Amino acid sequence: MELIGHGHSCIEIRLNDGTNLLFDPFINGNPLADVSLADLHPDYILITHGHSDHIGDMLAIAQANKATIIAIAEVAMYAQSQGVKAHGMNLGGRYVFPFGSVKFVPALHSSGYEIDGVMTYMGEASGIILEAEDKKIYHAGDTALFSDMRLFAKDKSIDVAFLPIGDNYTMGPEDALEAIAYLNPEITIPIHYNTFPVIQQNPAIFVEQVVGGKVLNPGETILV
């Protein structure tokens, strides 16, 4: 499979069977984004939580591609109310899709989205574990460090972990290193940094401290 970075927490995954998955599609308004909405053609859009820098352009992209949104129940219900296909899930739940399985796991964070000028609760924040093509991928979304992360690798080791390092809104580099000790992934890719002034970090310094650490700059691809 191919892992492609699009800045912030937006990750595109192209599976060998041709299925295209897109996580947290924050493109418009993202100064790091390397693509336009017209460049993206996902079959499924996976959303970790309801903040605007993660929901991003999910509706426009889903409508243009007839994609199915996979998200926490409240985010999925909002998407359905806007006329797009969505599959709602919740923490601890796992579902087998044609491309593989998706499990929603806890994240320590908040989740709300402004609708018609009102901040609306959008369910629990989550991380997402994808298992496809004999690979296990963990996208942590936005989260603080918590010790139960070690459970995510209990049954099967994690091949790739996408972990936020920006600090301020999420865990910073020090806590992300502790998370790696819990998760023990083969590859760790930092996300959620340098998009805003308060989350400035040097990813190169971070990955130097990590066995299997890799920086996935916008537009770059990693094969796993």
From Swiss-Prot:
Record's keyword terms, sorted: Hydrolase
Family affiliation: Belongs to the UPF0173 family.
Gene Ontology molecular functions: hydrolase activity
Pfam families: Lactamase_B_2 (PF12706)
NCBIfam families, alphabetized: PRK00685.1
Keyword Hydrolase: yes
Organism: Enterococcus faecalis (strain ATCC 700802 / V583)
Gene3D superfamilies on file: Ribonuclease Z/Hydroxyacylglutathione hydrolase-like
InterPro entries: Metallo-B-lactamas, RibonucZ/Hydroxyglut_hydro, UPF0173, UPF0173_UPF0282_UlaG_hydrolase
SUPFAM superfamilies (UniProt xref): Metallo-hydrolase/oxidoreductase
Protein name: UPF0173 metal-dependent hydrolase EF_1371
HAMAP family, alphabetized: UPF0173
